[in-house]
């Protein structure tokens, strides 16, 4: 039971221009379909999603299924993951991208035209408020606390034992 431990990468390249209905099958140029070096996740936002079959399903050394079962389940896992991702992105990617665009545009508009002017206005008014607050504190709160402190400082306790 020779278990294959190497991962293989299989790619299918199809080119509508290279396939002629009259002259037979011609092979597509793989360089035409090769990724142009463009990383779709340059900031590694979804690095946690890079899972393989061994990360999800693992058999300990003491319990192994038949090699053919392991190989077939590995193939079905990879195919179903690939097909379901493509299927879901066909139906969900465009509507969700549209909704995310609307959400981010709304939040950007609110931030630019409402939140930041409000914050800047508050920061402009704060020195005046700080001066008024200091005057109120000096005129009302400080004398009140001083008088309460003097009242409590004259209190004395005497303990007697009967």
Curated annotation (Swiss-Prot):
What biological function has been recorded for the protein in this entry? May act as a scaffolding protein within caveolar membranes. Interacts directly with G-protein alpha subunits and can functionally regulate their activity. Acts as an accessory protein in conjunction with CAV1 in targeting to lipid rafts and driving caveolae formation. The Ser-36 phosphorylated form has a role in modulating mitosis in endothelial cells. Positive regulator of cellular mitogenesis of the MAPK signaling pathway. Required for the insulin-stimulated nuclear translocation and activation of MAPK1 and STAT3, and the subsequent regulation of cell cycle progression.
What is the name listed in the Swiss-Prot or TrEMBL entry for this protein? Caveolin-2
Tell me if Membrane is a UniProt keyword of this record: yes
Q: How does it assemble?
A: Monomer or homodimer. Interacts with CAV1; the interaction forms a stable heterooligomeric complex that is required for targeting to lipid rafts and for caveolae formation. Tyrosine phosphorylated forms do not form heterooligomers with the Tyr-19-phosphorylated form existing as a monomer or dimer, and the Tyr-27-form as a monomer only. Interacts (tyrosine phosphorylated form) with the SH2 domain-containing proteins, RASA1, NCK1 and SRC. Interacts (tyrosine phosphorylated form) with INSR, the interaction (Tyr-27-phosphorylated form) is increased on insulin stimulation.
Q: Which InterPro entries match?
A: Caveolin (IPR001612), Caveolin_CS (IPR018361)
Phosphoserine modifications at: 20, 23, 36
Q: Which gene encodes it?
A: CAV2
UniProt cross-references to PROSITE patterns, sorted A to Z? CAVEOLIN (PS01210)
Name the family the entry cites: Belongs to the caveolin family.
Q: Does the keyword Ribosomal protein apply?
A: no
List GO terms (cellular component aspect).
acrosomal membrane; caveola; caveolar macromolecular signaling complex; focal adhesion; Golgi membrane; nucleus; perinuclear region of cytoplasm; plasma membrane raft
Q: Which residues carry this modification: Phosphotyrosine?
A: 19, 27
PTM notes:
Phosphorylated on serine and tyrosine residues. CAV1 promotes phosphorylation on Ser-23 which then targets the complex to the plasma membrane, lipid rafts and caveolae. Phosphorylation on Ser-36 appears to modulate mitosis in endothelial cells. Phosphorylation on both Tyr-19 and Tyr-27 is required for insulin-induced 'Ser-727' phosphorylation of STAT3 and its activation. Phosphorylation on Tyr-19 is required for insulin-induced phosphorylation of MAPK1 and DNA binding of STAT3. Tyrosine phosphorylation is induced by both EGF and insulin (By. similarity).
Q: Which GO terms describe its molecular function?
A: D1 dopamine receptor binding; protein heterodimerization activity; protein homodimerization activity; protein kinase binding; protein-macromolecule adaptor activity; scaffold protein binding
- What UniProt keywords apply to this chain's record, in alphabetical order? Cell membrane, Cytoplasm, Golgi apparatus, Membrane, Nucleus, Phosphoprotein
**Which parts of this protein are intramembrane?**
87-107
Query: Might you name a Gene Ontology BP term for this protein?
Result: basement membrane organization
Q: Which residues lie on this side of the membrane: Cytoplasmic?
A: 1-86, 108-162
Q: Source taxonomy lineage?
A: Eukaryota, Metazoa, Chordata, Craniata, Vertebrata
Subcellular compartments: Nucleus; Cytoplasm; Golgi apparatus membrane; Cell membrane
Q: How does it sit in the membrane?
A: Peripheral membrane protein
């Amino acid at each position: 039971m020779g278990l294959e431990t190497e991962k293989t990468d299989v790619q299918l390249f199809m080119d509508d221009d290279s396939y002629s209905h009259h002259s037979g099958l011609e092979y597509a140029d793989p360089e035409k379909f090769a990724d142009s070096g463009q990383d779709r996740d340059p900031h590694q936002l979804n690095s946690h999603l890079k899972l393989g079959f061994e990360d999800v399903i693992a058999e300990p050394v003491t319990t192994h299924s038949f090699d053919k079962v392991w190989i077939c389940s590995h193939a079905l896992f990879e195919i179903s993951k690939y097909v379901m991702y493509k299927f879901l992105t066909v139906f969900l990617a465009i509507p969700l991208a549209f909704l995310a665009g609307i959400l981010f545009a709304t939040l950007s508009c609110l931030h630019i035209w409402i939140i930041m002017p409000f914050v800047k206005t508050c920061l402009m008014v704060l020195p005046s408020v700080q001066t008024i607050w200091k005057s109120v504190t000096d005129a009302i709160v400080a004398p009140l606390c001083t008088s309460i402190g003097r009242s409590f400082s004259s209190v004395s306790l005497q303990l007697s034992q009967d």
